[in-house]
Structure formats: structure tokens, C-alpha cells
Amino acid sequence: MSGGDVALAPLPQADGRPKPRPVVLLCQMPPFDDWLVCGVSTQLHQEVPGFDETIGPSHADFRRSGLKAASLIRLGFLAVLPAAQLHGRLGSIAPERHERLLERLGAFLQSRHKA
């Protein structure tokens, strides 16, 4: 798998129990090459404008993402997971979307570091 891929992975829910959810692989983390991932949700009303990103049937990369419904890529729903916990590649998002997510997350972290 590589950055920008969409896979299934167990992520903790509000009740603390893990549930298989789609995730976008953002990047591998040192020293063990675990994956920094962000959760994907169909709860579009949870969008943080200018931070999260929606993907749906009108987007060129929706079909190849493997997602079944319009979804929200939630940059505020992060996890670091070993590759062994990634269960099956569903598809991938466009390289431009992947890069935009990384830049947006990096800018957010930089702004918090300076504060």
C-alpha cells in the first residue's frame, strides 16, 4: 500500500470500541513504517470547513477511491496503525487530493506549534 490509498482499518468509536472503517493512508511514520491515517465518514454534517475534505460521485477520483457513498475525509480523526492492521485496499484518492490533505494537516500543525 502507499500514500493516498483507501483501506479498511479498526478505528476507535465514541464508545472506545474499534470498528472497521475506511481510512486514507497519509504517510508512513518512523521508525517502524506504521501508517498515519485519517478516518473517512459518511457523516457529511461533521465537516470542518477548510480542514476536512468531501469526496463524492461528482469528483473525478470518487470511483477509484472504492468508497460507496459521498464521504468526508476527516483530518481531525487521525490514528497511527501498523500495516498489519490495514485490512484490504479499497482504492485510492487522486494524488492532488492526497497532497492537499498533507499540506493542510502540515499547515495546521505548524500554526499550533507557533501559538
Regions found by a protein language model. Give the residues of each.
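Conserved functional hotspots at enzyme active or ligand-binding sites that engage polyanionic ligands
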Residues: 1-115
